Amino acid sequence: MILLILIIISLSYAYDENFVKHCVNLAQSTYCVTSTEEWNCKTCESSIKLEYIVENSGSKAIQGFDKYTNSLFVSFPGSSNLHNWIENIQVNKISPYNNSVEIEKGFYKAYNFIKKDMIINLSLLTKKYNTNKLLITGHSLGGAMATIMTYDILNLFPE
């Protein structure tokens, strides 16, 4: 299993095994959560306040506040339905940002299905929790979507 963990904060951290396990659990929990009231699966942690589940055209992410890192979070699952697998095989590269960055078309499409709602939610969460710290994590396809979102966030909010 490949797990991509990205964190966007102003500080850098040394390797912390507990932090890595926390992020793995956060990524894993995206597979079992179906509503914001159901934060009770085996890998769901009490330090997490789940606020949003964003789904569209087979793409999914969960968003909320993480007391463990004192940050907002976005977590993406890996491929879990036929639509995801169709996106996975769309490997031709595109340049949606009008620069030299190339992204596999399927990964970008999967991310783009839920991008707008996630950005709106992040704006609301930033105000609610009074923080601009953000943890972005994902597994497999979700790792690709987490990487794209990181690029988007850094370009949308360069400060």
Model-derived regions: residue spans:
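Sec-dependent N-terminal signal peptides
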Residues: 2-12
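Gly/Ala-rich beta-loop-alpha elbow adjacent to hydrolase catalytic centers
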Residues: 138, 142, 146
